[in-house]
Amino acid sequence: METIVKRRKNQGVDKKMAKFWHYLGNIAGAILSLALYIELQVFYFYPQRIRLDHMRALVTALVTVIVLFVIFNLYKRQLKEHNDLGFNQAPHWDMRRIGIAIIGFVLILIVSMVMLSLVGRGVSNNQQALNKIELHSKGLFEIMVVFIAPFCEEVVFRGMFFNIFFTKKKITNKWLGIIVSGFLFAYMHDPMLSKFIFVYWGLGMVLAWVYMQTKDLRYSMLVHMCYNALGFI
């Protein structure tokens, strides 16, 4: 009898340790992905630092493909290990979710206008920095902001975030996750915690809502890309 009890206790300990290492591994994957994304920005925002002359474009393209591949596959690997909420299930495209993405795009425009009117005039430190970077990026700035940044940020702040936190099927978990995901997204864009953090927070929550409603990153990425593209029209 004692042997059975000990065995059950050991099994319980083993499960807890496995859960702990799984959780730690997912956090490490998210940190690695964010670090790769930040390093990739150097190729687009500060191309003059990459002293490769005529090989610069080829190296930039190659590094981009590798980074995006690694980040997205880390996300998919997390889903293979644990995916109770049913993310990234095929088929990936349908009219219902396209409709949600359209609603999300309209919402993000409304939230942006409302929040900007509430916080008042001015430009966030993040936007000021981006404006300066754009002057020296030699045409690569738009590619990063419109395509690569939304891809990487959605994988990390929506995909990986909901693989690590708020993983249980509860309505409170869903909305708390949307709020926290939005804040982390906002903090990355405004670490000085200025009044503009509320603008980014609102945008991040809309993108998190789109992801949670569609259960597919493709839709929040699409909304994010379309919103960022408006800045260049």
Predicted regions and their residues:
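Membrane-water interface at transmembrane helix exits
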Residues: 38-45, 72-79, 112, 116, ...
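Transmembrane helix-loop-helix hairpins at the membrane interface
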Residues: 107, 138-233
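Context-gated lysine
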Residues: 6-9, 15-19, 76, 80, ...
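Residue-level signal for functionally critical sites in structured catalytic/ligand-binding pockets
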Residues: 2-3, 25-26, 30, 61, ...
